[in-house]
Amino acid sequence: MTDTGDRTHPAVERVEAALRAAGVEPRVRWFETATPTAVAAAEALGVEVGAIANSLVFTFDGEPLLVMTSGAHRVDTAFLGERLGGRIRRADADTVRAATGQTIGGVAPVGHPEPLRTLVDEALADYPEIWAAAGHAHTVFPTTFDELLRLTGGEPTPVEGPASAG
C-alpha cells in the first residue's frame, strides 16, 4: 500500500526540491514498509522488476559513480570498468552516504550534495514509466527514461556484458 500523504524526511525533501528545480512536480509515494530492493518495490507497486531504477553507488578510480540500473539487471563491474577505462568497485555505506546524503536502500538519482557522474542502464528505456527511490527506503517516485537522463545528466549505457546478459 502506498500513499502520497504528509510524511517528511530531510533526504526526501532534498529530492523533492531537486525535482522542482528541474521543472518536475514531485510525486513521491511512501510505503508502509521499507522497499530497499527492486523486487520489494516492484511488488509494492505492482510493476515489473525491470521498471525499477536501482540507484547503485560505486567508485570509479576512487571517485563516486552513480549507476542507475534496471531492477532486472546486475551491474557487471568488470564490463563497465573496461568500457570506462578504469576500475569500478561497490561503494561502502559511508561513501554512499557522503556522496548522496542518503542511505543504501533509499538512494535517489537526485538530491545529492554535489552532482554525481551518472550512468543509466539502457534497458530502462524499455519501460514507459520507471520508478526510483526518493531518498528514503520507504519512498519512490515515477519518471521516464528520458527524464531520468535529463535529471541526472546521465550517460545511457549497457550495464551487463554479453556473458552476463541473459
What are these regions (language model features)?
Residues 1-166:
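Extended, low-hydrophobicity, polar/charged segments
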